[in-house]
Amino acid sequence: MNRTDEETVAAAEEILKQMKENAYSFESDSGKADMVTGKVLANYQWSGDAVYTLDQAEIDDYYLAYAVPEESTNIWFDGWVMLKDGIAGDAAKQQAAEAFINFMSRPDNVVRNMYYIGYTSVIAGGDSDIIYAYADWCYGAEEDAEDTIEYPVGFFFSGDNTDPDYVITAEADQVNRQLFAQYPPQDVLERAVVMQYFDQENNQRINQMWVNVRCFNLASLSWQDWAKIGAGVVVVLAAVVLFLKRDDILRRR
């Protein structure tokens, strides 16, 4: 995930160029609606956006699935950061910022936030089981459900994935749907990494790679292609010259 050497970036560029031939677009916003409407069959999404898409499609009895590459994936998170020196020396602003973080970290507000945005909670809940109860309420199977699985989430709530207190009895299809997206199992987390910050040199290399993928690359044209382009330009110029001469003759008459 974090290799930025020239050889790896070049290999990634070639793969992306091949994908481009069969890709609707390179983006992560309108893809949610495109998945729901069936315009596209696969879309690279953040987990919370994937949950939103799965939920929306399900309203129309259209069932989508969520998957993580076997090779690797990135562990991502949105974070609020409190500077160790405060906020420009303003004690009142620092207190307000800390109060906001504390407010957003209250288990009851965490549940409200999860319900609204579809993303995994920032905390496990500490002494409160309300967050686990909410996850169980969302994904726990009905009592009369026949095809169910035991889905351990102890790694998140207690740090022990064998903890019997944190196992959700879910419908079997949740192994590749919303529950999987919000609480990926340990084997997925073990092959996931946090993406590193690109320094200036690597950032420039990655940006150039994207330019090469998204834009037309003149360097990729063969001499036959250039010959065809040249012939086309000659034909167009000849047509323009003939048109102008014809127009000049008509005006003289």
Give the role of each language-model region.
Residues 6-10, 29, 91-95, 197-204:
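Soluble non-cytosolic domains of exported or imported proteins
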Residues 47-51, 71-73, 87-88, 108:
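Solvent-exposed loop/turn segments at secondary-structure junctions
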Residues 82-182:
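Mature extracytoplasmic/periplasmic domains
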Residues 2-3, 20-23, 84-87, 193-197:
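Second-shell loop/turn segments in exported
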Residues 17-24, 36, 40, 55, ...:
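Sec-exported extracytoplasmic/periplasmic mature domains
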Residues 15-17, 61-84:
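Periplasmic-binding protein-like
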Residues 1-65:
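Ligand-binding pocket segment of bilobal, Venus flytrap-like solute-binding proteins
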Residues 158-253:
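Conserved C-terminal helix/tail region of periplasmic/extracytoplasmic solute-binding proteins
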